[in-house]
A protein has these predicted regions:
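The feature marks proteins involved in alpha-glucan
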Residues: 1-14, 26, 472-480
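Substrate-binding/active-site clefts of carbohydrate-active enzymes
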Residues: 5-9, 18-199, 498
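Conserved, mostly hydrophobic/aromatic
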Residues: 17, 42, 52, 71, ...
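Active-site rim elements
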Residues: 22, 194-199, 319-329, 381-391, ...
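Conserved alpha/beta catalytic core and glycan-binding cleft of carbohydrate-active enzymes
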Residues: 165-167, 182-376, 405-452, 457, ...
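Aromatic- and carboxylate-lined catalytic core of secreted/periplasmic carbohydrate-active enzymes
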Residues: 211-212, 218-219, 378-417, 502, ...
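C-terminal accessory region downstream of the catalytic core in glycan-modifying enzymes
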Residues: 400, 450-484
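C-terminal beta-strand-rich structural cap/linker in extracellular carbohydrate-active enzymes
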Residues: 478-517
Length: 517
């Protein structure tokens, strides 16, 4: 049917999904199963944008959809094209924007299924010689200087917009596209690392053309660049000399969270460095932050919750079970997600299941695991079971997302640091009409903790420590605080005096009306 969906003009709160592994059973899920069983969960969770992975046809299921063979075909293992259209239409009726994970950075090297040697040569769509081979991915690299390649890829963008009514794209592997050596084994530390002889200017030209075409076809479409190098201008408007992406991912944020958890004791977390990393972005480019995506949960890596709790998750997630490692993990999981969202530039992303602390890692069926689907699924029963703690994390995430939408948190780009204490592991900042208070110290609580704040009345509207979120409940719910005047030279200061429990966070609202939905 003709597209009738009109996207709301609000910052994207993205729920990243893989249709095949979204089901509970140890098998490949379908578009129909996703529409009936998973889509309602996403709507209930409060996210406003759905990002679909692995849509383009790919021969090897374990590639996570990134080794594409047919760029114009939805993956047949998930169902028919009509099933995908029904999924998107249903999501639209629920108010969800639907984005597609678009793979234009390379193509599968398989010659029977893919484009390689399509006309008998290696260079019809790709570079000839060594440059046509991606050494890290064992795939073929497009030659973006060829008109037939530009026509092929640009028409592919329009095809998914027109035929399936996608609302935009996440462009995968942008770093690999724009550098001749694909950005491999390279550290980008200054502006001198950009715009030198290592740049593939043809690839940058293609990306600019793609953004122009997409926004001509759908002026309200969303395009997101996945780039780890920090190339300036990717998400700047073309009218200002940029390449036209609407957003770029803040990919340093999840890497920094993993580094903190792996390399530092809780009492040694460098709070100043954390604050810098959370806010390290250019003012002229919109960014989307996240604590973890599918990348952090792949085999060989671990989700944040599993890094924090580990094997204790198997035996100590009962609602009445008290375990110090579990308590620590649950507290930090909530705090990490809250501060990542609260400091996000212009959008936020979550990978399916991470909102309730899905255990373990993602491991697609392969020879090394006897072709098992055990870790290529989502165990929704964990969050449905009221006798386990997973549903408490899900409840917190629901209320956190609702708070961001109700208070239009990400509409306000200015994040104002009010107070930072590295020794005590305290960060306090203001955004919109909200004050966010974080005490990352693992064992020190602070009474009568004072910091300067705008004068007024403040009500606590979200508390990570609350029992309904799996916390010990050390604060009175919905308590109200008033600033006090401290006489100091050369001028007086308005101060808030608060109790800060160890390893906890809460949000204060500066108004007389309660903003909660």
């Amino acid at each position: 049917k003709k597209p009738t969906f009109k996207r709301k003009k609000e910052p994207p709160l993205i729920y990243e999904v893989h249709v095949g592994m979204a089901q509970e059973e140890e098998k490949i899920g379908t578009f129909q199963e996703f529409t009936h069983n998973v889509l309602p969960r996403i709507v209930d969770a409060g996210y406003n944008t759905l990002q679909l992975m692995a849509i383009q046809e790919h021969p090897y299921y374990g590639s996570f959809g990134y080794q594409v063979s047919n760029f114009f075909a939805p993956s047949s293992r998930f169902g028919t094209p009509e099933d995908l259209k029904k999924l998107i239409d249903t999501a639209h009726t629920q108010g969800l924007t639907v984005l597609m994970d678009l793979i234009h950075s390379h193509s599968v090297s398989n010659e029977i299924e893919g484009l390689s040697r399509f006309d008998g040569t290696l260079f019809q769509y790709f570079h000839d010689g060594p440059r046509g081979k991606h050494k890290a991915w064992d795939s073929r690299c497009f030659d973006y200087n060829k008109h037939q390649v530009l026509h092929f890829l640009l028409s592919n963008c329009r095809y998914w917009l027109d035929e399936f009514h996608f609302d935009g794209f996440r462009f995968d592997g942008v770093t690999s596209m724009i550098y001749l050596q694909h950005g491999l084994s390279r550290i980008f530390t200054s502006y001198n690392d950009y715009f030198d002889n290592s740049i593939d200017e043809d690839a940058l030209t293609y990306l600019a053309l793609a953004n122009r075409v997409i926004h001509c076809v759908r002026p309200d479409a969303i395009t997101i660049a996945e780039d780890v190098s920090g190339m300036p201008g990717l998400a700047a408007p073309q009218s200002n000399g940029g390449f036209g992406f609407d957003y770029r991912f803040a990919m340093g944020v999840p890497d920094y969270w993993i580094r903190l958890i792996k390399e530092f004791k809780d009492e040694d977390w460098p709070i100043g460095h954390l604050w810098f990393e959370l806010n390290n972005r250019r003012n002229d480019e919109k960014t989307i932050s996240y604590a973890e995506s599918h990348d952090q949960a792949l085999v060989g890596d671990q989700s944040i919750i599993f890094r924090l709790i580990g094997k204790e998750m198997y035996n100590h997630m009962g609602i009445n079970d008290h375990n110090l490692k579990v308590d620590r993990g649950i507290a930090l999981h909530k705090m990490i997600r809250l501060i990542t969202l609260a400091t996000a530039g212009n959008g936020y992303l979550n990978f399916m299941g991470n909102e309730f602390g899905h255990p373990e890692w993602i491991d697609f069926p392969r020879e090394g695991n006897n072709w098992s689907y055990k870790n290529a699924r989502r165990q929704w029963h964990l969050t449905d079971n009221v006798h386990l703690k997973y549903h408490l994390l899900a409840e917190f995430d629901n209320d956190m997302i609702a708070l961001a939408r109700t208070c239009r948190l990400l509409d306000q780009s200015n994040v104002q640091l009010l107070h930072e204490d590295t020794a005590k592991k305290v960060i306090i900042f203001k955004r919109a009409d909200l004050i966010f208070v974080f005490n990352f110290h693992p064992y020190c609580s602070f009474t009568d903790y004072r910091f300067e704040a705008p004068p007024g009345k403040y009500q606590m509207i979200l508390d990570c420590d609350a029992p309904e979120y799996g916390g010990p409940g050390r604060l009175l719910p919905k308590q109200t605080h008033f600033t006090i005047m401290e006489k100091q030279k050369p001028q007086n200061h308005h101060m808030l005096s608060l109790y800060l429990p160890a390893r906890s966070a809460f949000v204060l609202y500066s108004a007389t009306e309660d903003p909660q939905p």
